[in-house]
Amino acid sequence: MEFRFNFLLKTLKSMKVIIRKNSAEGSLWAAHYIAARIKEKAAVTDKPFVIGLCTGSTPIETYAELIRMVKAGELSFKNVISFNMDEYVGLPVEHPESYHSFMHKYLFDQIDEKPENIHILNGNAPDVEAECAAYEKAIVDAGGFDLFLGGVGEDGHIAFNEPFSSLSSRTRVVTLTQDTREVNARFFDNDPTKVPAQALTVGVATVLSSKEVVILAFGSKKARALKDAIEGPMSHYCTLSGLQNHPAGTIVCDENSISEVKVSSYRYFKAVEAAENA
């Protein structure tokens, strides 16, 4: 499969929507795009590439391809600094559904990123407010995100920035909505009461302060969220809509997740990619 990124590497000035047949193709595209960005920076500076990372089922295929590239010698994370976007409050780090466990299982234990460059919020910190403030500062001290890789919830939330989160929010403690706990119950024996009630999360403004944002959205359950984020007003009701105001935002989706946008919008995004890759 050929991956062409010249139009993105050179002309990112507004939201782009990359539409692929299915999640497998979209995930491959995202992995190779991330790799291209890491290599691009490495070619011109010794400064580390700073990336924001997400969890959940959506990025697993992307992580798998990044792992394959590292093992094949096509990519290295030795000069990459990562910050994960969220973590549950009160869930032991060793719990199989903690985001610490998830990231080590699906990415960190299989790549060459230095342990000291891996950052994940500590949901068991004695002072979670101080933990959030320190995390936000660490991102800034690292130089800010070169690229933030995120997913989107069925209600349009990014990270754990639930509907009505301020678009100017920063890393903080949040209370999860019942809808989110019910959706995430599939990871907790299908019991919403086992899903922690609170989490630590980077804020909407933390995400949007990244030099570039790449959002993965696959499947029909994400269709309404994408329609609201792409065609609706920018609103704290759909926190992904904040991407409308970002100069370098990209949504990678499949035919199912893009199915509710207007036909004219669909054709526009397909035409833009085709023309700029010509």
Where are the predicted features?
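Class I SAM-dependent methyltransferase SAM-binding "motif I" and its flanking Rossmann-like core
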Residues: 159-202
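Glycine-rich N-terminal segment of FAD-binding domains in flavoprotein oxidoreductases
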Residues: 40-71
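A glycine- and small-aliphatic-rich helix-loop capping segment at beta-alpha/alpha-beta transitions
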Residues: 64-76, 99-101, 163-172, 232
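N-terminal glycine-/serine-/threonine-rich phosphate-binding loop
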Residues: 5-51
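ATP/nucleoside-binding phosphotransfer catalytic cores, i.e., glycine-rich phosphate-binding loops
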Residues: 202-205, 209-278
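Glycine-rich phosphate-binding loop
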Residues: 143-168
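Short beta-strand segments
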Residues: 52-56, 84, 121-122, 149-152, ...
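Ligand-binding beta-strand-loop-alpha-helix segment within the catalytic cores
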Residues: 8, 75-149, 270-278
